[in-house]
From Swiss-Prot:
Keyword match Isomerase: no
Function of the protein: Zinc phosphodiesterase, which displays some tRNA 3'-processing endonuclease activity. Probably involved in tRNA maturation, by removing a 3'-trailer from precursor tRNA.
Domain of life: Bacteria
Active site per database record: 64 (proton acceptor)
UniProt-listed PANTHER family: ZINC PHOSPHODIESTERASE ELAC PROTEIN 1
Quaternary organization: Homodimer.
Keywords assigned by UniProt, alphabetized: Endonuclease, Hydrolase, Metal-binding, Nuclease, tRNA processing, Zinc
Species assigned in the record: Exiguobacterium sibiricum (strain DSM 17290 / CCUG 55495 / CIP 109462 / JCM 13490 / 255-15)
Lineage: Bacteria, Bacillati, Bacillota, Bacilli, Bacillales
Cofactor binding mode and count: Binds 2 Zn(2+) ions.
The reaction(s) this protein catalyses: Endonucleolytic cleavage of RNA, removing extra 3' nucleotides from tRNA precursor, generating 3' termini of tRNAs. A 3'-hydroxy group is left at the tRNA terminus and a 5'-phosphoryl group is left at the trailer molecule
Name the UniProt record assigns to this protein: Ribonuclease Z
CDD domains the UniProt entry points to: RNaseZ_ZiPD-like_MBL-fold
EC numbers for this chain: 3.1.26.11
């Protein structure tokens, strides 16, 4: 499982960074978080296939986070995507998409389900638990917390060998079922499994100033994706426009007890001094990393 950053810039495209779009890649699915202008073009230079994208989460309706959505939806159909595409986003996204697709005469070969979210709501999506919280921006904005299911512990192979259980299909049954039968005797599978492994926990935040919603979403996650539009010297400016500095993002990560912080939504004004932002974050939280376009990060629990 990994994050793949398609766009890490703020406000408008630059020569170095496209606007917001992040893919979450899993062997069983591909998700997107935001879909700014030219996201589908960024995909041409990535391992991501548009027709494989099954779910898109939109954090808010500012253009740098959604203007790539109609084009992506259309291209997904042209590339023979036929499976359901689900889009989560703030109130208004359904009306905007329906009007855009209608006016442009866009025909989709697949079902499209647009779900307008509210703070505090939870969803089950493709085996993951999704929780939504409101953030504090100049515009209605949300963040998403993603939690995977608890995984069963590792097999106690030596104990099974001592019992005489041969490797093969029965091992798979032990991992999948509550009990198993060997040579006429029923056993509890848990007696031959290690401690359960907690499911992966992630949080992807939209544009925001530091707020309680950010802390709730980020609490003890394995990876937090947080905007870092400005340097610390621009903190007042960041607040006026509903954004965070890299240091403020790191403070959220520290308070919330996260394992790793990925910084994105970087202003073009820092094109020659981006490491300054990362350094300011690391003064507070060492596991802070400033992302670039087409950078991927493997997610570990």
């Amino acid at each position: 499982m990994e994050f793949y950053f398609l766009g890490t810039g703020a406000g408008m495209p630059s020569k170095q960074r496209n606007v917001s779009a992040i893919a979450l890649l899993h062997p069983k699915m591909t998700w997107l978080f935001d879909c700014g202008e030219a996201t589908q073009h960024q995909m041409l230079h990535s391992p991501i296939k548009p027709r494989k994208v099954s779910t898109i989460f939109i954090t808010h309706l500012h253009g740098d986070h959604i203007f790539g959505l109609p084009g992506f939806i259309s291209t997904r159909a042209a590339l023979e995507g036929t499976t359901l595409l689900t889009i989560f986003g703030p109130k208004g996204i359904k009306e905007w998409l329906e009007a855009t697709l209608r006016i442009t005469g866009t025909y989709l070969r697949y079902p499209l389900d647009v779900i307008e979210v509210e703070a505090g709501q939870t969803y089950e999506q493709e085996g993951f638990h999704i929780h939504v919280e409101a953030l504090e921006h100049r515009f209605l904005a949300y963040g998403y917390r993603i939690e995977g299911q608890e995984e069963k512990g590792a097999l106690h192979v030596e104990a099974l060998k001592q019992l005489g259980v041969p490797s093969g299909p029965l091992y798979r049954q032990i991992k999948q079922k509550e009990t198993f039968v060997f040579e006429g005797t029923e056993y509890q599978s848990t007696d031959f499994l290690g401690e359960p492994k907690p499911g992966i926990k992630l949080a992807v935040l939209g544009d925001t100033v530091p707020c309680e919603g950010s802390l709730r979403l980020a609490e003890k996650v394995d990876v937090l994706v947080h905007e870092a539009t400005f340097a610390d010297s621009e903190q007042d400016h960041a607040g006026r426009f509903g954004h965070s500095t890299a240091r403020q993002a790191a403070e959220i990560a520290l308070k919330a007890g996260v394992k790793k912080l990925l910084l994105t939504h970087i202003s073009a004004r820092y094109v020659d001094q981006e490491q300054r932002l990362e350094a300011e974050a690391r003064e507070v939280f060492e596991e802070s990393y400033l992302m670039t376009d087409h950078q991927s990060v493997v997610i570990k629990g």
